[in-house]
Amino acid sequence: MHLILVRHAKAAPGQPDALRPLTTSGHLKAIELGELLARKQPAAIVSSPLLRARETAAAIARVAGLEPVVDERLAPGATAEGLKKAVAGLGDTVVTVGHQPDCSEIVLALAGREVEFPTGGFAEVEL
């Protein structure tokens, strides 16, 4: 499986953590990500339940012609094992949208390499 881990785009401060929406620049970045990642023909997009991740996933999904799936296993504190269970059987290429430091820790666990994840950043891993 080709796995594309995305960190949510830039979110606005001043809200309870789970309810922080994307900023205007965050929405634009999410659309840009969608245009880039749609070329990789993902079979599914799986998101953390937090609003900023769901909004990022929705923007990517719109461009890719998909409906995002929300999975609690991608919420803050996500693990490589939980992520593997969340994407099992979803297709050859899957995009996940999550949080830091989880994204970096998952790439390290799955691929043995350290990756920086700015907001709206992504990394690709083969499972």
Model-derived regions: residue spans:
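Active-site-proximal alpha-helix that buttresses catalytic centers in soluble enzyme cores
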Residues: H2-A80, G91, C103, R113-G120
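A glycine-rich beta-strand to alpha-helix segment
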Residues: D92-A109
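Short phosphate-coordinating micro-motif centered on Lys-Gly-acidic
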Residues: G121-L127
